Structures are given as structure tokens and as C-alpha cells.
């Protein structure tokens, strides 16, 4: 205190001397300094003291100036929050229009930006909910900061009440928006569930109708006088042979087929066993030639049946040296060996018509599907003689397979595939 008084006296004396002896052309410049600079080395003149403290008027004036700046800052913050709420309200109105199904066309395209809400109503609601929750958190943080500042600086009660009331109004508006969004989200969920249930009911009705049609076509003139129709290249239309194969050391497979696809007829049949999906497969994929796969080993067959006409094909194979033969319309077009030699065909697998299996009984690929009609699919456990194959192909004899015969009650169809009465053998010959 003594030092301050001494400094004040010295300052007063210097000022008096300056007045008595002014320096020509000189002037005094007053510059405002921050409190830190004053404390560091520029002491200010002592303010009038009364009992060692500021007067009530000066204390109130300082508090009012401080909180006037605080109120200006809070107004700016509240203005920014008001703009954010206005923007979110606008987006909510757009969301409500979208929920009614009339705001947008199904063919529109766009990106999910702040000006272009996502197409999925659920995503819209979730995005707005997150935005409102963020705004609420910011308001709560602002309110907490306000309480802290008020407790530290002694904010006048009228200012505190005004700000508290304004924050309360904003919070209530925010809670109302959140409640509206929750109701909207629940409504959209209910509408989506109802639409999904309606779709499932429609699909079930169609499936039941297809099943009725399939059953209605089961009365054929004879058990083998039918064909399996696979009209589309999909991964769900197929036929399934109920019986499975025993262990085989030789076989002959014959069938009639008429392909509706080009290039590549797809997969007329496939046989898969656990551990080997390509135990026996006949496939023509893309522009590749027809291939016979046995135990995933490949032989290319010189067969050409993708002209949309009925064709009779037979394939023989024996484990001895892997010998194979390929017949088309009764004529032997190719032969070879070393196709999975000394490998017996494994028993207990699944035999599928029209699809290539990647796992036993499933994982079909639409690009490898057969499109067209199949009939008279028979399997024998031996290599048929060439004359026997000719007689079957020219309708001279009816010779069912002794392992897999072509009969109605041994073939199931799925996914929209169907069974229909087949043309007579003579009619198929005329189509060649």
C-alpha cells in the first residue's frame, strides 16, 4: 500500500511539473491496456477505496458491463440455434411429405445431402433424430455453462430468469420435435410392415396357384408321357429327381431336350454329393462347347442342340480308363478316355434338372440354368450298346432306366417349373 501511495505521489508531482514546464510540440496519448499488462509492469492509479473495496455503484457497473457482453454473446448463440431449429423444422416437413408417399416419384435420383433427404424414410427420421439430439445436447451444455458463469460472477437475477426462460422454451420445442419424429418413425415402421405382409400374402397366393396348376397337370396318358418346362433363366426354377444313385462303375444317361436359349443351353442336369458338387454334370456355358464333368474332371462333347428343336442325346461312361461316348439323335458323334478313370460314382447325392449345383441341392447360378423342356430322362448302370441307343432315339423301343426311370411320381418341380404332357416320340422325331 505504501508503494502504491508513493507511486501516486510521484505521478502527481510529475504531472504538475509537466504542466508548469510543458515541452513544446509534445502531447500525452492515453492507451487502454489489458489487466495482465497492468499487473505485469504498468500499474494503474488506485481507484477510490472505501473500506478497502469498490463502491456498490462501481461494482454494479462492472457486473452490468460484463453481463451485457455475455447477453450479446448468448443472443448470437440463441440466434444460431433458432436457425438450426428452423432448418430442422423444414426438413421435418419434407419428411412428412415423403411419408405420405406423394412427395417424390419412384424414378427420381439424388444424393443424400443436407438439401436432399435420403430416400429411405427410416433413414430420414434417424438423421433428423440425431440432429435434434445434437442440438439438445448443445442447448444443455449452453445452459450448464450459463449456470456456471452465473454462479461465478453473480449474474443479476433478472438476466438469469430471462435466459433460463428462453432456454426452457427452446428445450420444450426440441422435445416436441423429438416426440413428433418418434411418432413419424413408428408410423413409417407400421406402414412398412403392412406392405411387407401384403407382399408376402400375394407371393403365397401365387405359390399356391402354381402348386395347384402343377397338380392339375399330373394326370398324363402314361406315367412317362410328360415333360418338365423351365421357361426362364433363373436360379429358382428346377426339377428334382426323388431317387438317388447307388455307387456306379459305369452308366448311360439318355434324355430328350429342346433348348430355348442361345448361346449356351445351360445345365440340363447335375448330380452332386457331399464333398463334390460336380460329381456328374452336363453343361454348356456361354460360347463354350458342351462339357461332361465327372468328379470335377472335364471332357468336351461334340454335341450341337441349341437350335430350339427336340434332340435325343445319350452319354455313356465307364470307370475303366475313363472311357466315354456321346450320341445325338442316335448317332455317335464323339468318344474319349481318361475322364476320371477308376473313380466310382459316389452314392446318396442329389440329382437336379435344369440347374448346376454349387452345393448339394442348392446355390444355383442363373447364368448356368437350362431354359427349355426336358423329357425321358433315364439312367442305366451299364454302357448301353449303340443299337440300343439308336432304337430309343428312333422310337423303336421304350426302354426305361433301371436306376432312374422317367416317371411322374419320381420328379418334383419347384419355383415355377411345371410338368406338361409331352409330344409323342414320333412328333419329336418330326421336329429334328
Swiss-Prot record:
Binds 2 calcium ions per subunit. Residues 1-14 form the signal peptide. Ca(2+) 1 binds at residues 278, 356-358. Glycans are attached at residues 149, 190, 394. Its main location: secreted. The keyword Secreted applies. CDD domains: PTX. It comes from the Eukaryota. The keyword Signal applies. It is found in: Secreted. Disulfide bonds join 254-314. It holds the Pfam family Pentaxin. One of its GO terms (molecular function) is carbohydrate binding. Homooligomer or heterooligomer (probably pentamer) with neuronal pentraxin receptor (NPTXR). This is Neuronal pentraxin-2.
Amino acid at each position: 500500500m505504501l508503494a502504491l501511495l508513493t507511486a501516486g505521489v510521484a505521478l502527481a508531482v510529475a504531472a504538475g511539473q509537466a504542466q508548469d514546464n510543458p515541452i513544446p510540440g509534445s502531447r500525452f496519448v492515453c492507451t487502454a491496456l489489458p489487466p495482465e499488462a497492468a499487473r505485469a509492469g504498468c500499474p494503474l492509479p488506485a481507484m477510490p477505496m472505501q473500506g478497502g473495496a469498490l463502491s456498490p455503484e462501481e461494482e454494479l457497473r462492472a457486473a452490468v458491463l460484463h453481463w451485457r457482453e455475455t447477453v450479446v454473446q448468448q443472443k448470437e448463440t440463441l440466434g444460431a440455434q433458432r436457425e438450426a431449429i428452423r432448418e430442422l423444422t423444414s426438413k421435418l416437413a419434407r419428411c412428412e411429405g415423403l411419408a405420405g408417399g406423394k412427395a417424390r416419384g419412384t424414378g427420381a435420383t439424388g444424393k443424400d445431402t443436407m438439401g436432399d433427404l435420403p430416400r429411405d424414410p427410416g433413414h430420414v427420421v434417424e438423421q433428423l433424430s440425431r440432429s435434434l439430439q445434437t442440438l439438445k445436447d448443445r442447448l444443455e451444455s449452453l445452459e450448464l455453462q450459463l449456470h456456471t458463469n452465473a454462479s461465478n460472477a453473480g449474474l443479476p437475477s433478472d438476466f438469469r430468469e430471462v435466459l433460463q426462460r428462453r432456454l426452457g422454451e427452446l428445450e420444450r420445442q426440441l422435445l416436441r420435435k423429438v416426440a413428433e419424429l418418434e411418432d413419424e418413425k413408428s408410423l413409417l415402421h407400421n406402414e412398412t410392415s403392412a406392405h411387407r405382409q401384403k407382399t408376402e400374402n400375394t407371393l403365397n397366393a401365387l405359390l399356391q396357384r402354381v402348386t395347384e396348376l402343377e397338380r392339375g397337370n399330373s394326370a398324363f396318358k402314361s406315367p412317362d408321357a410328360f415333360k418338365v418346362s423351365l421357361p426362364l433363366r433363373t436360379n429358382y426354377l428346377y426339377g428334382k429327381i426323388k431317387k438317388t444313385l447307388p455307387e456306379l462303375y459305369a452308366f448311360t444317361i439318355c434324355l430328350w431336350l429342346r433348348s430355348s436359349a442361345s448361346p449356351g443351353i445351360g445345365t440340363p442336369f447335375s448330380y452332386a454329393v457331399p464333398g463334390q458338387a460336380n460329381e456328374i454334370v452336363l453343361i454348356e456355358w456361354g460360347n463354350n462347347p458342351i462339357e461332361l464333368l465327372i468328379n470335377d474332371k472335364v471332357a468336351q462333347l461334340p454335341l450341337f442342340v441349341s437350335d430350339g428343336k427336340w434332340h435325343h442325346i445319350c452319354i455313356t461312361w465307364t470307370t475303366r480308363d475313363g472311357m466315354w461316348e456321346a450320341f445325338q439323335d442316335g448317332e455317335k458323334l464323339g468318344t474319349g478316355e481318361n475322364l476320371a478313370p477308376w473313380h466310382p460314382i459316389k452314392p446318396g447325392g442329389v440329382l437336379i434338372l435344369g440347374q448346376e449345383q454349387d452345393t448339394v441341392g442348392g446355390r444355383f447360378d442363373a447364368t448356368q440354368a437350362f431354359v427349355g423342356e426336358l423329357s425321358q430322362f433315364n439312367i442305366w448302370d451299364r454302357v448301353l450298346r449303340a443299337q440300343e441307343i439308336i432304337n430309343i432315339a428312333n422310337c423303336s423301343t421304350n426302354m426305361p432306366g433301371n436306376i432312374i426311370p422317367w416317371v411322374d411320381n419320381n420328379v418334383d418341380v419347384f419355383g415355377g417349373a411345371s410338368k406338361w404332357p409331352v409330344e409323342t416320340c414320333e412328333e419329336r422325331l418330326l421336329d429334328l
